[in-house]
Curated annotation (Swiss-Prot):
It is found in: Nucleus. Residues 1-168 are annotated as: SNAPC3-binding. The keyword Phosphoprotein applies. The keyword Disulfide bond does not apply. It comes from Homo sapiens. Signal peptide: none annotated. Part of the SNAPc complex required for the transcription of both RNA polymerase II and III small-nuclear RNA genes. Binds to the proximal sequence element (PSE), a non-TATA-box basal promoter element common to these 2 types of genes. Recruits TBP and BRF2 to the U6 snRNA TATA box. InterPro entries: SNAPC1 (IPR019188). GO terms for cellular component: nucleolus; nucleoplasm; snRNA-activating protein complex. Residues 224-257, 275-368 are annotated as: Disordered. This is snRNA-activating protein complex subunit 1. Residues 238-257 have a biased composition (Basic and acidic residues). Keywords: DNA-binding, Nucleus, Phosphoprotein, Transcription, Transcription regulation.
Length: 368
């Protein structure tokens, strides 16, 4: 029987939430256990055989996260998960946790690390499981059979829970740093003893910098911080989001200040009255500070300019109309002998004829 569908997803969800708490306390794990209602995982209508098989698979899955290469926090969470699954199972007698002999040394080493780090709640949980005889020691991790398989199924390692191998941290441990500090202090004391001036050592003896150990310590701390940020990109993204929000707020305030300054400059510019020359004082336009008055003033200026253009164009238009009339008359005169229509008498000829008749009438009256 393989891993039941959904069981691995639920276990990884619980462990991932426990990892987000950044804690190894049993109280935090029990709170997540209650919120997810993980105690009801064995509830349901199952026969005894199915119940036993399901419990074995659940305990084997939790035991997988208790061993390397997973991080210390995930291993502690897996220990709490084993304790919860073992005590909430419904099998009678209880199914035990299958432990291979080759892994037991690693388990004892982890127990010692818990005690040294003073994580007594996790150490107590492990001791309680041992006293309850929850472990079943076997030669192999899985039950072997006579069936031959061409492809051996290997359990996939969850990368999120995996403890990345860091050669720098393996090389420079806390013990190595402490030993380097002792050697550096001894070296500085020996320089003072050898030199003539006890207060100041000779420059010829200073083969390394005085802050050599401090520089190495700072580099190691920076590497640890970079390693944490790489392992938990969510925390780094949150800090970056906070910085971006602060930068966005500062940019918005700068834009508001610029807009206010531009508005003040515009108001000052439009509040000043333009003084026209003496010849154009009758066309002077007053401008107010508001945008509406400035727009109306601009409209008035445009209207006055249009009127000036029309006045200038009027005499020129009259001259052009008179010229056009003369040209039309000349054209009619030239066309007279060619056309058979009646002659056209202009207003000037009518006036001359009328004046001629009046002149002849006045002569006749004088004669009489």
């Amino acid at each position: 029987m393989g891993t039941p569908p959904g069981l691995q997803t639920d276990c990884e969800a619980l462990l991932s939430r426990f990892q987000e708490t950044d804690s190894v306390r049993f109280e935090d794990f029990t709170e997540l256990w209650r919120n997810m209602k993980f105690g009801t995982i064995f509830c349901g209508r199952m026969r005894n055989l199915e119940k036993n098989m399901f419990t074995k698979e659940a305990l084997a899955l939790a035991w997988r996260y208790f061993l390397p290469p997973y991080t210390f926090q995930i291993r502690v969470g897996a220990l709490y998960l084993l304790y919860g699954l073992y005590n909430t199972q419904l099998c009678q007698p209880k199914q035990k946790i299958r432990v291979a002999l080759k892994d037991w040394d690693e388990v004892l080493k982890f127990q010692q690390d818990l005690v040294n780090a003073q994580h007594f709640d996790a150490a107590y949980i492990f001791r309680k499981l041992r006293l309850d005889r929850a472990f079943h020691f076997t030669a192999m991790p899985k039950l072997l059979s006579y069936r031959m398989k061409k492809k051996i199924h290997r359990a996939e390692v969850t990368e999120e829970f995996k403890d990345p191998s860091d050669r720098v941290m393996k090389l420079i441990t806390s013990d190595v740093l402490e030993e380097m500090l002792n050697v550096h202090d001894h070296y500085q004391n020996m320089k003072h003893v050898i030199s003539v001036d006890k207060s100041k050592p000779d420059k010829a003896l200073s083969l390394i910098k005085d802050d050599f150990f401090d520089n190495i310590k700072n580099i190691v701390l920076e590497h640890q911080q970079w390693h944490k940020d790489r392992k938990n990109p969510s925390l780094k993204s949150k800090t970056n989001d906070g910085e971006e929000k602060m930068e966005g707020n500062s940019q918005e305030t700068e834009r508001c200040e610029r807009a206010e300054s531009l508005a003040k400059i515009k108001s000052k510019a439009f509040s000043v009255v333009i003084q026209a020359s003496k010849s154009r004082r009758h066309r002077q336009v007053k401008l107010d500070s508001s945008d509406s008055d400035s727009a109306s003033g601009q409209g008035q200026v445009k209207a006055t300019r249009k009127k000036e253009k029309k006045e200038r164009l009027k005499p020129a238009g009259r001259k052009m109309s008179l010229r056009n009339k003369g040209n039309v008359q000349n054209i009619h005169k030239e066309d007279k002998p060619l056309s058979l229509s009646m002659p056209v008498i202009t207003e000037e000829e009518e006036n001359e004829s009328l004046s001629g008749t009046e002149f002849t009438a006045s002569k006749k009256r004088r004669k009489h």
